[in-house]
Amino acid sequence: MPTGKLAPGDAAEIEVEVTKDLSTNRMGRPGADVLSTPSLLKLMELCSIEATDPFLEDGYVTVGYAVDGLRHLAPTAIGAVVKVKAVITEVNGTRISYKIEALEGDQKIGVSTHKRAVISKDGS
């Protein structure tokens, strides 16, 4: 089983500085210079990959198939550092579930649950 080394409670954390490329202004549209919700989701997905993919058998990766309960709770300005933590909550065959939180300092700025499936790198 390609997920044999994974278990509930396994986790990863990433820290990322918010840049213009991650902001609501990334496409030249006027608005606040803050982390966009699509970028927050991207960081959450990257963190879940860090919690999983390095521990899979060779030839396997994960792909996302669901995001539930995504809430962007507070704005985060360009230059601020966001810390994202993904914790595996369930491993069911090739399906993996995560609880994810994002923080700026001590303030929670986002939460979600995420689900990924393990597939072979050739797509099977």
How would you describe each model-predicted region?
Residues 49-83:
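Hydrophobic beta-strand-centered segment that forms part of the acyl-chain substrate-binding groove
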Residues 2-37:
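Catalytic strand-loop segment that frames the active site of acyl-thioester-processing enzymes
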Residues 8, 78, 87-124:
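HotDog/MaoC-like acyl-thioester-processing domains
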Residues 15-19, 71, 115-117:
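Generic structural detector for well-ordered beta-strands
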